[in-house]
Amino acid sequence: MDGLQASAGPLRRGRPKRRRKPQPHSGSVLALPLRSRKIRKQLRSVVSRMAALRTQTLPSENSEESRVESTADDLGDALPGGAAVAAVPDAARREPYGHLGPAELLEASPAARSLQTPSARLVPASAPPARLVEVPAAPVRVVETSALLCTAQHLAAVQSSGAPATASGPQVDNTGGEPAWDSPLRRVLAELNRIPSSRRRAARLFEWLIAPMPPDHFYRRLWEREAVLVRRQDHTYYQGLFSTADLDSMLRNEEVQFGQHLDAARYINGRRETLNPPGRALPAAAWSLYQAGCSLRLLCPQAFSTTVWQFLAVLQEQFGSMAGSNVYLTPPNSQGFAPHYDDIEAFVLQLEGRKLWRVYRPRVPTEELALTSSPNFSQDDLGEPVLQTVLEPGDLLYFPRGFIHQAECQDGVHSLHLTLSTYQRNTWGDFLEAILPLAVQAAMEENVEFRRGLPRDFMDYMGAQHSDSKDPRRTAFMEKVRVLVARLGHFAPVDAVADQRAKDFIHDSLPPVLTDRERALSVYGLPIRWEAGEPVNVGAQLTTETEVHMLQDGIARLVGEGGHLFLYYTVENSRVYHLEEPKCLEIYPQQADAMELLLGSYPEFVRVGDLPCDSVEDQLSLATTLYDKGLLLTKMPLALN
């Protein structure tokens, strides 16, 4: 409590002559008054420029250059690709995605490919079965290949991961060259490289992930509610994300350890067995276990695979929560894991082969949106599945926390899929769990009613043995508790706890992926090097005329702690979860308003000379510190002295 309360101190910034009356129990920077005249002028300027920016034809999630053509809520309009309305059943026109029943399915029919894909079988639960709605996929649009977020070396299906497990910090691959293949993934990654805003890149990649379903429909009606199947009939959709060749290369070239990075498991006769030998997972051991019928689960593939890391690093900004992943390789005619439910929102991306999935609704209300993962269930514990389907490469399956699931390979075909996970312990309850103890402590310090003693005889009428008592003293006691609990909201340090959770998210996050533009205009692109016995191209400096903005939108958070202001950031994070300690910079009180302006104005540029500081020295000191740490980019490349 002391730490969070103390966090409010430095946020009431300014030198002693400008000290304001304390604002108890708020740790939020944004909740505090700014220097009104100067900061408001800057924000008005920023707002007007951002409005002008929206009218330009830059790629965005709503522009022709970057959006996915997807079905509108009203299927009475023309469908993407010129499909006639008559191709959709009347019922589907009334309810574009079918009845919101046990599961939701979407089938995309590519313009140039027709693959035989097993239909999903829906088993009625407590609600009517969902209808399969056929939605033509958007026509393929050719994207220029001169600027790739992930270039050929990182995206080729047969290429090694190439990144050590301890790699940290933002990275860009500039090896150049043309991939030997093309895929929807490659095209969307090339498109992301052309979008200037990291938030718009995250929205665009999520739109691609669940296409052709509109994201607003997904979040409004399905997120945390229903299982969703997207049937694409395009085996190349995820090509280049991860492959069995990538896994084999990792086993040969990386320090993959059993238990830490790789699990070998099988599910036989209703029992799961984990068969992890000690030590490194060399190819001989791993593939022998696979041949013996074990599924191989690669934990945290983003630590080894550049492409998976880039994929997750972009999406984590969409969720506002850590995005993780596992990769599962299952041999033919086998099942690796027992039925269970997880404590994460799961997106299953089928990469290779086929796999039969069965998904079940939570059995009881306490399992809905589960806070912890379940133990293994037996088949006798399960009812009828709400969704039973065979996933083909390119298909997507989503199910919320608490949905029981199991999967097996059949018909002599192996399966490789990646599960993208997010929203672990990111609930209202977790937020309140952090707030309430602090609110009680603050209330006891500031309100005498919380310090008054309990009735001397309260044990005579309170407790389980008196729960059926009609004693009026019991009624009065319960009413007093309700009144005090209602008052706690006035003392809840909501902003301070929000800042602490944001700080935790910064520490959980993967390091950012840089576009070509971000690299060229930041410290990562400076041409400083060692040549002929000395460093050359040294001396780039910011001036008051330099225009800057944050490198990306979600890479930093300003938090007050222990009477000081700290800017926590992600650019030095590791791809291995919490391998590095949290990284931060101290921000001086006279620079706090300027720091807030930079955080709030992204992606608009701000002149260094317009930063609301007391002196030019403070302006240049803040901007230079942020630039040198890789947190700022400039509108134009810096001139070298």
Curated annotation (Swiss-Prot):
Keyword field contains Lipoprotein: no
Cofactors that this protein relies on:
Fe(2+)
Q: What is its main location?
A: nucleus
Show the stretches that span the lipid bilayer.
none
List the residue ranges of the region (Disordered): 1-35, 54-80
What EC identifiers does the entry list?
Answer: 1.14.11.27, 1.14.11.79
Give the binding site residues for Fe cation: 340, 342, 405
Keyword Oxidoreductase assigned to the entry: answer is yes
The set of disulfide-linked cysteines is none
What function does this protein fulfil? Answer: Oxygenase that can act as both a histone lysine demethylase and a ribosomal histidine hydroxylase. Specifically demethylates 'Lys-4' (H3K4me) and 'Lys-36' (H3K36me) of histone H3, thereby playing a central role in histone code. Preferentially demethylates trimethylated H3 'Lys-4' (H3K4me3) and monomethylated H3 'Lys-4' (H3K4me1) residues, while it has weaker activity for dimethylated H3 'Lys-36' (H3K36me2). Acts as a regulator of osteoblast differentiation via its interaction with SP7/OSX by demethylating H3K4me and H3K36me, thereby inhibiting SP7/OSX-mediated promoter activation.
Q: What name has this protein been given in UniProt?
A: Ribosomal oxygenase 1
Q: Which organism is it from?
A: Homo sapiens
Quote the gene name from the UniProt entry: RIOX1
